[in-house]
Design a protein with these regions (language model features):
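Transmembrane alpha-helical segments of multi-pass small-molecule transport proteins
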Residues: 16-22, 42-65, 81-85, 247-262, ...
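Membrane-water interface regions at transmembrane-helix termini and the short interhelical loops
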Residues: 32-43, 55-78, 266-272, 303
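Membrane-interface loop-to-helix entry segments
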Residues: 54-55, 63-93, 280-282, 287, ...
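Flexible loop linkers connecting adjacent transmembrane helices
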Residues: 1-13, 38, 69, 182-199, ...
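Hydrophobic alpha-helical segments and their helix-loop junctions in multi-pass secondary transporters
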Residues: 80-107, 117-137, 294-302, 327-339
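Extracellular/periplasmic helix-exit of transmembrane alpha-helices
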Residues: 141, 162-191
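Loop-to-transmembrane helix boundary motifs in multi-pass membrane proteins
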Residues: 11-12, 49-53, 159, 163, ...
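Hydrophobic transmembrane alpha-helices that form the core helical bundles
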Residues: 14-45, 51-56, 216-235, 271-275, ...
């Protein structure tokens, strides 16, 4: 992505985009590492700061030793333990008519319009995280995707979004059924896991924590590599997870340094949940800077050949760009006006 950002926007604007993207990547990586440490603490009872260091060392070792295919399988399959929340949501027997009513946009909590819009921006930002674009586009280049790979990966993306959306709805259902009537605000990472424990006991709690652990651990790996891909592509370094460290030393050093700096950030005692919220908002702000060069490339027949955007794709692409531009402009003002959604 970032070789195209530099080419399409110029060095200065491209560098500004790179810096903004790296800051967001670092914030996200730090938040995910904090999440890994919290899960490990809930599972082991060991000191939080010790587990932060162990989490970073463990993630670096995993990235250094395992091929990416095994990292995908390990974190992907164990992350599916999160499906315990879907089963828990069904077992709690919610009022499904109320669940269906929840799909109609609107606020029933008495919150102001600004608070409602802030959460709209946050949800859209969480679904459009730029690091996913950096990570998977770089992986596509590294794996030498051809046209025959596009169909399979479209299906994979649809399944992934459907699975993520289903998990999100399930978490909202269990929160509404278990926590809202008791006046509990699930502000801590471990709180949602209690819903699985309520339904399935210790086994449910274990599945929930393992699922969260590997989901956030996988995201930490993705953000660190996304940051390294960005730097390497912008400055023209040799890059690739499949390269030996000695063959791509600056790329390797980049993702290790991102882990190390994220470690320092989390060691300051910052709340990982709050850091996640801020990283989502700032990723929304940076998103148009990345999206525009991609839209320009999609219209370049020299790059895209027969896959160049048609008229309908351009209309949708421009409409989407206008949407994310509006979201980007309003994100920080809404965060300040609503005190981070607190009203």
């Amino acid at each position: 992505v970032f070789d195209q950002v530099r080419e399409r926007t110029g060095f200065s604007a491209g560098l500004a985009t790179l810096i903004a993207s790296e800051v967001v990547n670092l914030m996200t990586c730090a938040a995910e590492i904090g999440g890994v440490a919290i899960c490990l603490q809930l599972l082991s009872g060991l000191p939080y700061r010790l587990l932060i260091a162990l989490a970073v060392v463990g993630l670096i070792v995993v990235c250094w030793v395992l091929p990416f295919e095994w990292i995908e399988r390990l974190f992907g399959y164990l992350g599916l333990c999160l499906l315990v929340f879907v089963v828990a949501a069904i077992k709690l027997h919610p009022d499904w008519s109320q669940v269906a009513h929840g799909f109609v946009p609107g606020s029933s909590s008495g919150s102001s319009l600004a608070v409602y819009l802030y959460f709209v921006v946050g949800l859209l930002g969480a679904a459009m995280t730029p690091y996913e674009v950096y990570f998977y586009s770089s992986g596509a280049v590294e794996d030498r995707w051809s046209r025959k790979d596009l169909g399979l990966n479209k299906v994979t993306a649809i399944i992934g979004y459907t699975l993520g959306g289903t998990l999100s709805v399930a978490l909202m259902i269990v929160a509404a059924v278990l926590f809202m009537p008791r006046g509990i605000s699930p502000e801590f990472l471990g709180t949602p896991a209690l819903s699985a424990a309520h339904v399935f006991g210790q086994v449910g709690l274990l599945l929930a924590l393992v699922g969260i652990l590997f989901a956030v651990g996988g995201a930490a790996i993705e953000t660190s590599f996304a940051g390294a891909y960005n730097l390497a592509q912008f400055f023209g370094w040799r890059w690739g997870k499949k390269e030996r460290p000695s063959g791509a030393p600056r790329f390797t050093l980049s993702w290790v340094v991102i882990f190390a700096v994220a470690l320092v950030v989390v060691m300051t005692g910052v709340d990982p949940v709050k850091l996640t919220e801020y990283s989502v908002i700032f990723s929304v702000v940076a998103l148009p800077l990345t999206y525009l060069p991609i839209l320009l490339v999609a219209n370049d027949r020299a790059y895209m050949g027969s896959k160049v955007n048609g008229r309908l794709a351009n209309v949708l692409g421009v409409a989407y760009f206008v949407l994310i531009l509006v979201i980007a402009v309003t994100a920080i003002p809404l965060m300040l006006i609503t005190n981070g959604g607190q009203g």
